[in-house]
Amino acid sequence: MGCASSKEEVALTPLSDVNAAKEVADLKAQVDQLKRQLASAGQSAAPAAAGAVKGGVVETLFFPDEKLPCRNNRRPGGCKRQHCEYSHTPTSLSRFLDYLGSATRTLDICVFTITNDDISDVVLELHNKGVRVRIISDNDQAHTQGSDIDKFRQAGIAVRQDKTAAHMHHKFAIIDGRLLLNGSFNWTRQAVTANNENVTVLSDPKLIASFQQQFDKLWDMFK
């Protein structure tokens, strides 16, 4: 914000015994003015930054978490156990679940593999509330131990899988067409507590539109 150059412009000149007091007073006035300018610039920058967030990165979540979040603590009434081994404080997964659970109309999921029951439970709850959920996943991963794909199908959620020898390796979700969750994070327990992973939450309309276009393309391709 130009702080360095401003300080350089405030040059000290040799002071004589006669005008020392005046020079010091003038210098103090300049410093006070500079402080007021910096404060004013900071206040005016805040709305601009807020606007940038609305159209860009909302938050980036990093894994692994030290512990899985306590399911009971996320429910009304909280956890009643005296010695609970799960986390009662916000974690990357709990934040992820908050974003995922905020869907009110649509949830489009395009993820390589889904085996994490905490995530699957939120997806099923949204489906039961009437949110239109669509899932695209990898065909090979759907048959691995712990996969929740069959659980989703049995619940009536629309699921499609790739039909090629290559992997469907995306890891993103679109919430109500207003939020995008995207990153390296596979929806597995291993990814939560062991792997170095990331999920970026974005709200940029153009970026979301491009991911929605890709989702719709794959959805039609994997009929």
Swiss-Prot record:
InterPro entries in the record: PLD-like_dom, PLD_domain, PLipase_D/transphosphatidylase, Znf_CCCH
This protein's UniProt keywords: Endonuclease, Hydrolase, Lipid degradation, Lipid metabolism, Meiosis, Membrane, Metal-binding, Mitochondrion, Mitochondrion outer membrane, Nuclease, Transmembrane, Transmembrane helix
Transmembrane annotation, as ranges: 7-24
Membrane topology: Single-pass membrane protein
UniProt xrefs under CDD domains: PLDc_vPLD6_like
Pfam families assigned to the protein according to its UniProt record, in alphabetical order: PLDc_2 (PF13091)
Keyword Mitochondrion: yes
EC number: 3.1.-.-
Residue ranges annotated for the PLD phosphodiesterase domain, each copy included: 164-191
Highest rank taxon of the organism: Eukaryota
GO CC, one annotated term: mitochondrial outer membrane
Location of the protein in the cell: Mitochondrion outer membrane
Gene3D superfamilies cross-referenced by the UniProt entry: Endonuclease Chain A
The protein's assembly and partners: Homodimer.
Described purpose of this protein according to its UniProt entry: Plays a critical role in PIWI-interacting RNA (piRNA) biogenesis. piRNAs provide essential protection against the activity of mobile genetic elements. piRNA-mediated transposon silencing is thus critical for maintaining genome stability. Backbone-non-specific, single strand-specific nuclease, cleaving either RNA or DNA substrates with similar affinity. Produces 5' phosphate and 3' hydroxyl termini, suggesting it could directly participate in the processing of primary piRNA transcripts. Has been proposed to act as a cardiolipin hydrolase to generate phosphatidic acid at mitochondrial surface.
Name of the protein in its database record: Mitochondrial cardiolipin hydrolase
Origin species: Chlamydomonas reinhardtii (Chlamydomonas smithii)
